[in-house]
Amino acid sequence: MISSGDVIWWGNQGLTVSESPYWQRVNDTILKQLPPPDKTMLDAGLEGRWFIGIGNHEVWGDPKIEGVLSAVPYLRKLGVTPENLIYKFDYQGVRFIFLWSGKYDYRSPSLWDGDRPKYAEQMKQMQQWLDEAKANSIKKAFITFHYPVFCRAGLGPIPEPDNPHKLIASYAKDMEVVVFNGHVHTTEMYDVDGVKYLMLGGGGAEQDPILPGRTSIKVTADYPPDLYWKGQPPKEEYNYVLVDVQPDQKTKFTLNRFRPWSAEPFGTEALFS
């Protein structure tokens, strides 16, 4: 199970699972419900089933990520520390990469200001990890970080020059590359230069389409199209995506949704089909 971040509000009401009402809720509703890792996962060095691309809310009032490391201590074995918020692992022929986009700056709320490590160092590390995957004949890479590469709503996309799309897209000819983002509270999807982008901000927080002024933002006429709402204004929706990965086959994405305003509130939809 992968999260693109912001699973809590802040650390100002307690840091660890034993203190924070937010981490207690994550623990009770998600982590405790998951079965222990099986032998295949343990052999791959994975001692849990839930992995997060750390968002700005995880460090708000908790700069040393005590909450994250108390809830999912096995991330330490993948290299996560208060000074390093990025990591990677391989599982059944897929390379998983998790980056750190930043702590939030109200003056530019999607600016990649991550400093553990800084943007340039993260890009160098991602390039090394993707080169390594390519050399090992890994054909699929899933990259997760909080701020969105492409976005038409809410807080908007990562601004240039620190938007990683061009670097990520340079690997699309060699492997299937999928990027999972969050931060903005709605759902959008893009297929740009061979890279599939899923902005999955419908995990539970109040949705931008019901917040004044956040339903949409101005973008250029040639901005990539959102393939989810397909030009229609986004609406309130809560969802998660199941990703079916099989060797040497096209990855399948199935979104399961809840629309509280709809006469048919529950539904599923195949993405990128």
Region locations from a protein language model:
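Active-site beta-strand/loop signature of hydrolases that rely on acidic residues for catalysis
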Residues: 1-12, 55, 142-146
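Glycine-centered small-residue hotspots that permit tight backbone geometry or close packing
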Residues: 5, 201-205, 260-263
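Short, well-ordered beta-to-alpha junction loops that form the rim of enzyme active sites
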Residues: 56, 100-101, 144-149, 183-184, ...
